[in-house]
Structure formats: structure tokens, C-alpha cells
């Protein structure tokens, strides 16, 4: 299946469910406790990450989509930490605070990337009045393109049928990550995403793909489901839809370190893709690719558009194209080991024109490899105004990566690329325009490391702003 990334900036998703805080304590283990036959971990690093439905919202926000999160918390430090982490990634939190209950927290102790123990701090939210959550859903539905109900059986979805009815009446697709064997609770959902063990707990052991299909279709009929996606670990995913042939997708995972939160990534990608205008088939393809990325990370994690693009295009395997910072560092190290000269430049590159192409070709001629660092969408808006960029980051990077002159493309979030240039330290830093070398962001760091800084002229008569103005004038004529 040939799939391109949708413009996730168009997507608005409502996530409702059981939110929790995941805490991680990391440290080495070198001895056994004299008090009991257990390892002693010397804790050196502590991390806090949103978990459960909050991790689903994080996955959506990491794509550049808008996520609104509704759930139940206590009034405690864990709730404040959860809100802080989510605010940092621009997830809109609309929590219902229950003073008498603690925020659900899961503490994991790890050593050498191995989880030794998990401690759960929770009492659940059974018996809580569903009215405030239902009111928040009603308020949000007119603004969103998809709803996720993330069920961890902690009480936030006690009135799940009422939630499904609200979404269906509003004509908004409702996707559910189920919990337990009572699928009657999810009657009328647009899409259910059980893993294989959850699916078999309801329909019985399946000994072939055909049995999965037959029993899945029967399940859809029984509970009035529009579609069913069974996630099958190393065997990939199976999508079932009414009146359409089953779609089997093999796994794209290369290495599996941790499956924590993989289901959150899948349903988050599905909803964001659908809300951005993708078909269900396309959304499942992207979700499968995202799952292959996230299981290669430790702990609850998210997937960026760059990582997703690499996964569906295979660019990480070729060693060229759109890259993460760590991938680029490796590629640059290998290039230097081959004796190649690395050139780096940066810019917005919103509407690519002949001046850009000429400039990049000239920069490439100055060395053996060319890195182009690209302003993120937020960075571009701060520099160019709220109407820019015209093209989202992923599209801008894809166009640049397709140019013969460009070897590697990487984004940066700041207003200037100084940090990333200081991290990469190219042999030659190039900038177009009338700058002086000492005025160029990152130039001092490159020179201090023994590199060079040069200024190249832009081709006269070529300007993104002029192109935009011409288009606007044409629209007004």
C-alpha cells in the first residue's frame, strides 16, 4: 500500500479515558540486599511520563495534531506533574478532579534496561458521577474529527455507552481500546482495537487467520461495530470492515525492546489519521508503522512524523533522507570515517523555488555531503508570521530530501539552528544572503571546532514571499 502522511495539523481529536502517571527509576544493580534475596538498585535517574489515556494524547500531539484530554485525577502532586508534562507538549487537559482519590500512578524500577518491579498506586474511580465527563464530551464534539475512548478499567469510562451514543449522534467516529471481556459495553463503536489475547478471551482460541476473520466478523455483527482491528504482536494486524475484504498487515518492527504503550500509539495514530482525512485502510497502515517504531523504545513513548516517515519510506535503512538527530550523528560520523566533507545549511524552505534549488546545489558543490536543517512549523510561524508556513514541516522535508543535492534533512524547533549546528559541527557551515560569517547562528561553534563558515548569494528574483503575493493577487483578480 502506497501511503503519504496526512496533514496532521488539520486533525483535532478528543481522548477520554483513564489517565495515569508513569514514573521510572533507573540505576545500576551490582549487589544483592543483605535484608532479603533481592537486587539493590542505586537510583540515578527519575523520569515521569503521562500514561494510559494521557499517553494516547501525547502520541496525537507528537504528530502535530490537536489533542484534548478528559479524565479523572486526584488533587495531588501526581496530578500536577501529569498536567505539567502534558502542557509541555500542548495537550489540552480538561480533567475532573476527585479530591478523595489519588491520581493513578505506576512506578517502574529498571536496571540495564530491564524492568525489575512495578508498583501501582491507585484506588480506582468507581462510583464517580459521570455527569462532568459527559458534559465535557458534549462541549468538545463539535470541534473534533475523532473520539478515542481509552479503557483501562479504572472508572473513567463507567458510562461508556452514553459516550458512544453522544459521538454517534454527533457523527464523529469513536475508536475504543477495550479492556476485559465484556464487549457489550462497546456496542455501536466505529472501531474496536483489541490485541489478540483480548480478542481470543471473547471469541475463543483461533488457530488460523481465517478463524480470526470469521469470528471477528461475527463479533462485529453481534455488537454493531463498523470495523475491528486485531493487533497481533509479531504477526502484525488484521483489519476487518463490513463488506470489504480483510486487510492483513505484517509487523514493521525491527527490534522489540518494550511493548509498554504500543496500543496507545496504535489508537492515537488511527484517530489522528482519520481526523486528518485518511481512509481507515491508510490509517491502519500508518498505525502499524508507528507501532513498529515505538516498540523499539524503552517505556511509554511517542512517534514523531519524522520517525513515521522513515518507517514508511525505509529511509532509515538507506542512510539518507529525513532523519532524527541521533540517526544524523551516526551518518555524519560514518561520512567522516570515509574522508567526506560535510556541509550544513538551514532555512524554512516553505515554497521551494529555483533560487532554493540553485543555492542548495552550490552549497553541495563545496563538499561531499549536504545537511539541510529546517525550521519546524512553530518556529516558522514565529519568524514569518501566523500565516506561515504554507506547507507543513513533513512536506517541506520530503521535497528537500528528494533533491539530488541534499543528502540529509533534519528539523529544529528553536528560532535559530544554533543548538543543532553545535551538536553536528559540520566541516563547513553555509548561509545564503548578506550575512557576515560571525553573524551566522552556529558559526562560532563551527569555527571553534576547526570548521569553516561561508556566505553564498541567493539567485536574484526568487522569493517565497513574492510567490505567495502573486498567488494572492491571482485569487483577487
Curated annotation (Swiss-Prot):
<dbReference type="GO" id="GO:0033785">
    <property type="term" value="F:heptose 7-phosphate kinase activity"/>
</dbReference>
<comment type="similarity">
    <text>In the N-terminal section; belongs to the carbohydrate kinase PfkB family.</text>
</comment>
<comment type="pathway">
    <text>Nucleotide-sugar biosynthesis; ADP-L-glycero-beta-D-manno-heptose biosynthesis; ADP-L-glycero-beta-D-manno-heptose from D-glycero-beta-D-manno-heptose 7-phosphate: step 3/4.</text>
</comment>
<dbReference type="GO" id="GO:0016773">
    <property type="term" value="F:phosphotransferase activity, alcohol group as acceptor"/>
</dbReference>
<dbReference type="GO" id="GO:0005524">
    <property type="term" value="F:ATP binding"/>
</dbReference>
<dbReference type="InterPro" id="IPR011611">
    <property type="entry name" value="PfkB_dom"/>
</dbReference>
<comment type="subunit">
    <text>Homodimer.</text>
</comment>
<dbReference type="Pfam" id="PF00294">
    <property type="entry name" value="PfkB"/>
</dbReference>
<dbReference type="GO" id="GO:0097171">
    <property type="term" value="P:ADP-L-glycero-beta-D-manno-heptose biosynthetic process"/>
</dbReference>
<dbReference type="GO" id="GO:0005829">
    <property type="term" value="C:cytosol"/>
</dbReference>
<dbReference type="Pfam" id="PF01467">
    <property type="entry name" value="CTP_transf_like"/>
</dbReference>
<keyword id="KW-0511">Multifunctional enzyme</keyword>
<feature type="binding site">
    <location>
        <begin position="195"/>
        <end position="198"/>
    </location>
    <ligand>
        <name>ATP</name>
    </ligand>
</feature>
<keyword id="KW-0119">Carbohydrate metabolism</keyword>
<comment type="similarity">
    <text>In the C-terminal section; belongs to the cytidylyltransferase family.</text>
</comment>
<feature type="region of interest" description="Cytidylyltransferase">
    <location>
        <begin position="344"/>
        <end position="477"/>
    </location>
</feature>
<keyword id="KW-0547">Nucleotide-binding</keyword>
<keyword id="KW-0808">Transferase</keyword>
<dbReference type="InterPro" id="IPR029056">
    <property type="entry name" value="Ribokinase-like"/>
</dbReference>
<protein>
    <recommendedName>
        <fullName>Bifunctional protein HldE</fullName>
        <ecNumber>2.7.1.167</ecNumber>
        <ecNumber>2.7.7.70</ecNumber>
    </recommendedName>
</protein>
<dbReference type="InterPro" id="IPR002173">
    <property type="entry name" value="Carboh/pur_kinase_PfkB_CS"/>
</dbReference>
<dbReference type="InterPro" id="IPR011913">
    <property type="entry name" value="RfaE_dom_I"/>
</dbReference>
<dbReference type="InterPro" id="IPR014729">
    <property type="entry name" value="Rossmann-like_a/b/a_fold"/>
</dbReference>
<keyword id="KW-0418">Kinase</keyword>
<dbReference type="InterPro" id="IPR011914">
    <property type="entry name" value="RfaE_dom_II"/>
</dbReference>
<dbReference type="InterPro" id="IPR023030">
    <property type="entry name" value="Bifunc_HldE"/>
</dbReference>
<comment type="pathway">
    <text>Nucleotide-sugar biosynthesis; ADP-L-glycero-beta-D-manno-heptose biosynthesis; ADP-L-glycero-beta-D-manno-heptose from D-glycero-beta-D-manno-heptose 7-phosphate: step 1/4.</text>
</comment>
<comment type="function">
    <text>Catalyzes the ADP transfer from ATP to D-glycero-beta-D-manno-heptose 1-phosphate, yielding ADP-D-glycero-beta-D-manno-heptose.</text>
</comment>
<keyword id="KW-0548">Nucleotidyltransferase</keyword>
<dbReference type="GO" id="GO:0033786">
    <property type="term" value="F:heptose-1-phosphate adenylyltransferase activity"/>
</dbReference>
<feature type="active site">
    <location>
        <position position="264"/>
    </location>
</feature>
<keyword id="KW-0067">ATP-binding</keyword>
<dbReference type="InterPro" id="IPR004821">
    <property type="entry name" value="Cyt_trans-like"/>
</dbReference>
<feature type="region of interest" description="Ribokinase">
    <location>
        <begin position="1"/>
        <end position="318"/>
    </location>
</feature>
